[in-house]
Amino acid sequence: MAAVSGLVRRPLREVSGLLKRRFHWTAPAALQVTVRDAINQGMDEELERDEKVFLLGEEVAQYDGAYKVSRGLWKKYGDKRIIDTPISEMGFAGIAVGAAMAGLRPICEFMTFNFSMQAIDQVINSAAKTYYMSGGLQPVPIVFRGPNGASAGVAAQHSQCFAAWYGHCPGLKVVSPWNSEDAKGLIKSAIRDNNPVVVLENELMYGVPFEFPPEAQSKDFLIPIGKAKIERQGTHITVVSHSRPVGHCLEAAAVLSKEGVECEVINMRTIRPMDMETIEASVMKTNHLVTVEGGWPQFGVGAEICARIMEGPAFNFLDAPAVRVTGADVPMPYAKILEDNSIPQVKDIIFAIKKTLNI
């Protein structure tokens, strides 16, 4: 009775507020998309947008791709635009380059970039050099794509990083996506580019889901080639990486943050042309640099970054020598314990960061 009389004595507006039914709601979960599906979506949208785009490679059509990246595209676009080829990288890469010279926009899939060695003449001599050799008269709008870098248990001839190989060649653009957003935005930009673009995907990342922001779901979503992304802001040290090791760098940064060390993690996205402006600006802020890559140490991507820092304005801002974290200088072993020790792990990145900061 006391509670009821208390309500009676209160103003009507206040009583109605107390009696109003309250609803609790949870925000919808962010859309999760795997890297595989993001690439598939990007190719699908570009095939739909431009009838000059087509995909060719081993098992890309009826089998939906060795890694199911082209799943559903053959059923949607048919034999003329999703083309299964014989096991001859030199042959179908040459056909693709010729088609690009004739005005089409081929996507040439290598089952693994290790097999692109069979077609290196077509990629370098035919695709990369033609625009220059023709005095700018003959563009070659072609995409070479497929899994790159270390895989699991496939040994030396199927496990290595080609970022430095192709990044060395003028006339090529080279991109190396990490997450689903990267994968879709970069594959679409690569297909629309009038130059040959090498898209270095990662086999171990295909099935990994990432949050897919609303802007990435648009058919107009593009990531500009030649622009890096700061994945984590920091003030103590700059950590630069590409492809799968970006995730390792973020894990290392999370561990070190608990110890008071704030790492700025840069996802390169593009190997060539390299976004040195973003890297230099970060180094000028943090005064320290660590590069991380899955490739071999000699003449690698990290070595190129360090050389450019030495030659540019950021060098005078360094408080300690730059440090590289790379794969081991050996062909990829088969045994799992040796394989794990041949590519950078989170502990290796943490060690390098602490070494650079002298902590």
From Swiss-Prot:
Q: Where does K(+) bind?
A: I142, A190, I191, D193, N195
GO biological-process terms attached to the record: glucose metabolic process; pyruvate decarboxylation to acetyl-CoA; tricarboxylic acid cycle
Q: Where are the transmembrane segments?
A: none
GO terms, molecular function? metal ion binding; pyruvate dehydrogenase (acetyl-transferring) activity
Q: Which domain of life is it from?
A: Eukaryota
NCBIfam families, from UniProt?
Answer: PRK09212.1, PRK11892.1
Protein name, per record: Pyruvate dehydrogenase E1 component subunit beta, mitochondrial
